[in-house]
Each structure stands twice: as C-alpha cells, then as structure tokens.
UniProtKB/Swiss-Prot annotation:
CDD domains assigned: AdoMet_MTases (cd02440)
Purpose: Specifically dimethylates two adjacent adenosines (A1518 and A1519) in the loop of a conserved hairpin near the 3'-end of 16S rRNA in the 30S particle. May play a critical role in biogenesis of 30S subunits.
Gene Ontology CC: cytosol
Family membership: Belongs to the class I-like SAM-binding methyltransferase superfamily. rRNA adenine N(6)-methyltransferase family. RsmA subfamily.
Protein name: Ribosomal RNA small subunit methyltransferase A
NCBIfam families reported for this sequence: ksgA
Organism this protein belongs to: Thermotoga neapolitana (strain ATCC 49049 / DSM 4359 / NBRC 107923 / NS-E)
Pfam families: RrnaAD
Source taxon at top rank: Bacteria
Top EC group: transferase
Catalyzed reactions per annotation: adenosine(1518)/adenosine(1519) in 16S rRNA + 4 S-adenosyl-L-methionine = N(6)-dimethyladenosine(1518)/N(6)-dimethyladenosine(1519) in 16S rRNA + 4 S-adenosyl-L-homocysteine + 4 H(+)
Chief place of localization: cytoplasm
Stored PANTHER family: DIMETHYLADENOSINE TRANSFERASE, DIMETHYLADENOSINE TRANSFERASE-RELATED
Sites where the protein binds S-adenosyl-L-methionine: 23, 48, 69, 94, 110
Length: 260
C-alpha cells in the first residue's frame, strides 16, 4: 500500500504547523538505508517517522530501531505498517525533549523541515556516531559549505567541527506527499574524535557570525583584550574550521582564567 493510500485509509489530515511532508517512494527509503550500511546489532534513531516509509525499510535490516514521531495522530498508520517488526520501538514524543537516546546510536532520518536547525544541534549534542539525514537542499548546502561561500555560516561550522560530511544524493520534491516547494538532499555525517564542549562552542560560533558581514574585531568587541596580537580583520565566513577552533580555544582559556 502506498503512503498516500495509508493517509486516505485513516483520514489523516496534515498539520501545517508541523510542516508535515511524507516520503512516499520506498525506492528512496531503500537507497538511504543502503547508504547507512546497518548491522543487526546497531541501534538506529529515526527522527520524524511520519507515515513510516523509511521506518519500515530500517526495520527490515534487523537493527534495533527507535522511531520518534511527535504526531500521535499517525499512530494507526505506523502501528499497521510496523506491527510485524519486534525490533521497532515507536516513541510518540518530541525528539528535541528526549532524555535517553542510546550511546553509539546511528541517526537515519528525513528531518522535519520546520525544525531542521534545532534537530541538527541535537544530533551533535547526542554525539551520534553516524548520521544519514535528508534535509532541504538549501540546508544541505549550508551543512556542506566551505569558507568563502555565501552559504558558509553557523550551521556549516558547528556540524563540520564535530562530523566529517559528504553529499550522498539529491531527492526530488516529487517523491513526497504533499509535494514541498523545494528539493531535498541526503547527507552523511561521520563523527570526529574531538573533545570540544558543544554548548560553549556553539555560543562562540553564534557570536562570531552574529553580524556576518562584519569583521571578527566587530563581533568580538567585548573580548578584544583576550585576542591581543591576533589578526581579527577578516570575517568569520572567511575562516576555516581549524582557524575558528583556534580562536575558540583562546576565548575559552580566557574565560576559564577569569573564573579562577
């Protein structure tokens, strides 16, 4: 049965405030799962199970699947599609409020458009060892972007600091119900071995990108004494990930000294 048929069968009305669009083509779901290269002993977290197209393909791998879905109105569809898979746990709750995501889990998700930014931050916070995520094409460009490009900014830096990223493939808007206004892209994220405090780091990155066209000297004005002798004439969008980490470490050490 097609996703659209399930929606009709249960009289599901899409909730605009949740930005609901559902993947309707199982070929795309199969390709995503193939890229994830899951093993039966893996623990997989899906954020936004929707109508279960991707969830069902994840279940077929034999891995333990924890599928989050904020809309309990989709329960009849998900329960019908997934009842034969004992390895699937449905959690009808907001992933952003989750408190017990398993360690060393893998995230495989079609990220809900309306909360992409907060969810990407949560993926970093939970330190998933790998993530295969489908996002809006424009968001994917920001995740993958390099210094000097218009799309390079806060999201590029926080994701690439903690993960190696690469583009896997594009997904046309025609593969969704209803058709969104934009195309999507599937991105792979592999965790790096870095020891950086994420909440503190994202605060610093947000600060240096607060006025994107201004120089570091302008955006770091309250902390200029900390960066004495450091060239702050460039803009944050011109800096590599490594250069930003160096600046962050100077700022972090200064904060630690001031608290002693």
């Amino acid at each position: 049965m097609k996703t659209s048929d399930y929606l009709k069968k249960y009289g599901i009305r899409l909730k605009k405030h949740l930005g609901q669009v559902f993947l309707s083509d199982d070929r795309i779901a199969k390709r995503i799962v193939k890229e994830a290269d899951l093993k039966p002993d893996d623990v997989v977290v899906e954020i936004g199970a929707g109508a279960g197209t991707l969830t069902e393909e994840l279940a077929k791998t034999g891995a333990r699947v924890i599928a989050y879905e904020i809309d309990e109105g989709l329960a009849p569809i998900l329960q019908e599609r997934l009842s034969k898979y004992p390895n699937v746990e449905l959690r009808f709750e907001d992933f952003l409020k989750a408190r017990d995501v398993p360690e060393e889990a893998i995230c495989v998700s079609n990220i809900p458009y309306s909360v992409t930014g907060p969810i990407m931050e949560k993926i970093i916070e939970w330190r998933f060892k790998k993530a295969i995520v489908m996002v809006q094409k424009e968001v994917g460009e920001r995740i993958l972007s390099k210094p000097g490009r218009k799309s390079y900014g806060y999201l590029s830096v926080v994701v690439q600091t903690f993960y190696e990223v690469r583009k896997l493939f594009d997904v046309s808007r025609s593969y969704f119900v209803p058709n969104p206004e934009v195309d999507s892209v599937v991105v792979e994220m592999k965790r790096k071995a870095v020891e950086i405090d994420f909440p503190q780091f994202k605060k610093f990155v947000s600060m240096i990108f607060s006025k994107k066209r201004k120089t570091l000297k302008n955006n770091l004005r309250p902390f200029l004494s900390v960066f004495e002798g450091v060239d702050l004439s460039r803009r944050a969008e011109q800096l590599s990930i490594e250069e930003i980490i160096e600046l962050y470490n100077i700022w972090r050490r200064a904060l630690e000294c001031s608290e002693e």
